[in-house]
Amino acid sequence: MVGKLKQNLLLACLVISSVTVFYLGQHAMECHHRIEERSQPVKLESTRTTVRTGLDLKANKTFAYHKDMPLIFIGGVPRSGTTLMRAMLDAHPDIRCGEETRVIPRILALKQMWSRSSKEKIRLDEAGVTDEVLDSAMQAFLLEIIVKHGEPAPYLCNKDPFALKSLTYLSRLFPNAKFLLMVRDGRASVHSMISRKVTIAGFDLNSYRDCLTKWNRAIETMYNQCMEVGYKKCMLVHYEQLVLHPERWMRTLLKFLQIPWNHSVLHHEEMIGKAGGVSLSKVERSTDQVIKPVNVGALSKWVGKIPPDVLQDMAVIAPMLAKLGYDPYANPPNYGKPDPKIIENTRRVYKGEFQLPDFLKEKPQTEQVE
C-alpha cells in the first residue's frame, strides 16, 4: 500500500515537472521572438511623422496636426507686445494661440545646454541618444504641448517670448513654421518690466543699466536668428507701429502667414472669454492691459524714469536700439502719428471704460520669465 502511494506521488511529480518544463520552454521561445522583433532596426520614417488630431465639436471638424503644418511662433523680449500680438491673432476665428505654456522655452533651453556641452554630447551619443533621436522627441513633445493646451483650430500658434532664442532650431524641427519677432523700444520694455516687477531670469530689476544690457543681448540673439532663417519665415513686428496702425500691420502680417483677413483681429477686446476667442490667464502680467482695445497709452511711459547716467551711455549699453531703428538719444523718439480709431481708443482707455472682468480677477503671483 505504501509502495503504491509512493509510485503515485512520483508519477504526479513527474507530470507536474513535465508541464512546468513545457510551459517554460514555450515562454522562452516567445521571449526570444520578442527580443528578435525589438532588435530589428526601427523605421525612422514612422518616428518622423507624428500626427496629432483635434476635434472641434462646435464646427464638427477634425484637424490633423503634424510637424509639417504651418505653426506660428510669437516671441521677443518680455514686455514687447507679445501678449497683444497673440490676443489679436486669437481673435481670428481660424487661429488659436492661448496662454504662455512656460514649458516650451525651458525644454528648448535644456536642449541648448546639452548641445553646447561637448562632454554631455559625447555621453548622449555613447548612450545612443543622438541628435536625430533628440530632435524626434522634441518634435513630438512640443507638438503635444501646442496642440493639447487649448482648443483645436485650423492654425495653431505658440507665444512663449524666449522660445525664439531657439528660432533656428525650431525652424529645423518644424520646416513650415513661421515666426513673429516682436520688437519694442528697449527703454520702454525695461521700464515696463521694472515698474510692473516682472521677474526675468538674469535681469536685475534694481538696475536699468543691467536690464538694458540684458535686453540688448536677448534681442540680438533673436534678431540674428530671424535674419538667418530669412524674411520668408520670420517677420519683425515693431510694437509701436502695430499699436499706431493696427489694420495696416495686421493685414501685412496675415498675408505673411497666408491666412485670410478677418476684421475681428482689430477688436480682440470683444472676444475675451468667448468660445473660440481670446483666452487669458489670471496670473500673466499683461492680462489687465490686453482687455483694452489697441491704444498708445504705454508708448512713452518710460520717459523721465531712466537715470541720467544710463541715458548718457544708452548707445553703448544698448546698440541694438539703433539697429532696430530707434534713436538712442531721443527722449522720447517720434514713433509716429496714430490712426484716428486709435486716438479714440486711447481716449476711452483714459476714461476708464475698460475694467478687468470678474472671472479674471485674481491677484497675480510674482511671475518669472525664463
From Swiss-Prot:
Keywords: Disulfide bond, Glycoprotein, Golgi apparatus, Membrane, Signal-anchor, Transferase, Transmembrane, Transmembrane helix
UniProt xrefs under InterPro entries: P-loop_NTPase, TPST-like
Superkingdom in the source lineage: Eukaryota
Signal peptide: none
Enzyme Commission number(s) of this protein: 2.8.2.20
Record PTM: N-glycosylated.
Tissue expression notes: Ubiquitous. Detected in heart, brain, placenta, lung, liver, skeletal muscle, kidney and pancreas.
The keyword Protein biosynthesis belongs to this UniProt entry's keyword annotation: no
Main location, first listed in the record: Golgi
Annotated GO biological process: 3'-phosphoadenosine 5'-phosphosulfate metabolic process; post-translational protein modification
Lumenal side: 26-370
Family recorded in the similarity comment: Belongs to the protein sulfotransferase family.
Subunit-structure text: Homodimer. Can also form heterodimers with TPST2.
Function as written in the Swiss-Prot or TrEMBL entry: Catalyzes the O-sulfation of tyrosine residues within acidic motifs of polypeptides, using 3'-phosphoadenylyl sulfate (PAPS) as cosubstrate.
PANTHER family reported for this sequence: PROTEIN-TYROSINE SULFOTRANSFERASE 1, PROTEIN-TYROSINE SULFOTRANSFERASE 2
Name listed for the protein in its UniProt record: Protein-tyrosine sulfotransferase 1
The encoding gene: TPST1
